[in-house]
Structures are given as structure tokens and as C-alpha cells.
């Protein structure tokens, strides 16, 4: 729905995986690992260049990504509007002035926190409408903690067959995905069900947990400026 005929053609022919043989799936997986090795090699080149030019002790380096890949989890490949750990839980490594060595942060954080973190370490002032929070206090204060991190994804029918307004909250023990229009969702106890196989969303005994997580989702200001056509225009 929507978009040009060309964009619809691209969506139909190139954005969905056609049925694959086991051998083809193995090759896809091998290609993914190959791309990881390529990234690792070239990040190493960047770090070596910083060292060569004497900038490594005065540069904040953050290595992360926008999302993961299902890689067969839940019978899925690539990415999609299913917020399982393989897609959302990505690496985040930091090195630079003031960043403690061997520090591990177990609190849930978000890529929304990166911009405030850059500003904090650079001595700049954070904008008042930024939703993220600097990660510096989590790195430098051993008593600091974060209760939850948020994620959202809005899709038009052309991407998933139906319009979806998805909101996600991740704590250290639970995850809730809520679809705003229908009120449906998925909720997992990550401590006891790390592979997210047992949806607790409609379990009466879990209602209090679901309500608490829903309140966390609704605590985020709904003030995002329109950034263009949502994902799935084709």
C-alpha cells in the first residue's frame, strides 16, 4: 500500500526471503559470519589509525549496531516486527578517556542513549527533548542502575500485512511487546524463559507484571516529530 510502483516491486522481489534449501540457509549463515569478520577487520583498521596518529587516548570509541539478525531463532531470518532477543539485544562496547577498564553494565540501555553519551563526554549540553540518557553514570558510579529500556517500531500494512504500532519495554527480567491499536502483545519472563518460547501476555497470574511493564511503556513522552513515511510504504 502506497509508494511508487518501483518501490513496491523492490519490496515484493527483494525484501522477502523465498523458500530456501538447507544448503542455501547454511550459505546465508556463512555469509553473515563473513560480514562480521569483515566488520571486525575494518574496525581494527580504524583503531590502528587512531593509534598511529596519536588520537587513541583522546577519542571515545563506541561499537554497536542498530539491530541483530534472527539467524534461525524462532524459525526466522533477517529482521522483522518480532522483538525477540536476537534482534534487540546487541553488543555495546566503549573505550576512551574516563571509561573504566573491564567495567560491565548489566542494566538495560538503548541506542537512544548514545547521543546524550557523546555530548556528555565531549562536554556539550544535552537537548531537553532527547529521550535518551547518558551512559556515563552507569560506567563511573558502581551503585548506578537502570530499570528498563524502550523500543518502538511503526509499520504500514505493506510490510507486515497489517498496520502495527509496536512498543517494547525490556527490564533485566522481563520483556513486553505491546501493539497499541489492538492491545495485543507478547510478554516473556527472560530469567526463566530466556529463549522466549512461552508468551505470558494473557496469563491471569501475570497481570500485575504486565500492567507494571505497560506503565513503563506509557511513561515515555509521545512527542516524536514525524520523520517521513513509516517503514513499509511499499
State the predicted function of each range.
Residues 67-73, 100, 112-115, 120-186, ...:
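C-terminal cap/loop subdomain of S1 sulfatases and analogous C-terminal strand-loop tails that border
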Residues 213, 217-228:
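C-terminal helix-rich "cap/oligomerization" subdomain common to oxidoreductases
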Residues 33-36, 40-47, 51, 115-119, ...:
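Non-transmembrane alpha-helical segments in soluble domains
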Residues 1-58, 62-108, 121-129, 181, ...:
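Active-site-proximal cap/lid insertion segments
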Residues 74, 200-203:
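Residue-level signal for well-ordered alpha-helical positions
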Amino acid at each position: 500500500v502506497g509508494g511508487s510502483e518501483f518501490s513496491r516491486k523492490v519490496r515484493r522481489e527483494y525484501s522477502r526471503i523465498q523458500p530456501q534449501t538447507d544448503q542455501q540457509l547454511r550459505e546465508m549463515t556463512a555469509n553473515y559470519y563473513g560480514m562480521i569478520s569483515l566488520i571486525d577487520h575494518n574496525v581494527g583498521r580504524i583503531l590502528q589509525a587512531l593509534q598511529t596518529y596519536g588520537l587513541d587516548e583522546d577519542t571515545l570509541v563506541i561499537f554497536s549496531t542498530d539491530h541483530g539478525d534472527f539467524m534461525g531463532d524462532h524459525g526466522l531470518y533477517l529482521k522483522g516486527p518480532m522483538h525477540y532477543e536476537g534482534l534487540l539485544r546487541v553488543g555495546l562496547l566503549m573505550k576512551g578517556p574516563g571509561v573504566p577498564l573491564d567495567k560491565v553494565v548489566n542494566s538495560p540501555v538503548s541506542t537512544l542513549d548514545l547521543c546524550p553519551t557523546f555530548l556528555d563526554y565531549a562536554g556539550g549540553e544535552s537537548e531537553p527533548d532527547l529521550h535518551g540518557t547518558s551512559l556515563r553514570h552507569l560506567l563511573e558510579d558502581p551503585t548506578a542502575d537502570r530499570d528498563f529500556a524502550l523500543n518502538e517500531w511503526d509499520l504500514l500494512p505493506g510490510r507486515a500485512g497489517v498496520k502495527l504500532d509496536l512498543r517494547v519495554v525490556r527490564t533485566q527480567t522481563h520483556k513486553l511487546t505491546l501493539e497499541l491499536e489492538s492491545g495485543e502483545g507478547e510478554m516473556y519472563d527472560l530469567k526463566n524463559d530466556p529463549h522466549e518460547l512461552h508468551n505470558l501476555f494473557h496469563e491471569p497470574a501475570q497481570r500485575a507484571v504486565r500492567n507494571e511493564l505497560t506503565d513503563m511503556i506509557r511513561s515515555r513522552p509521545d512527542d516524536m516529530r514525524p520523520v517521513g513515511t513509516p517503514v513499509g510504504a511499499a
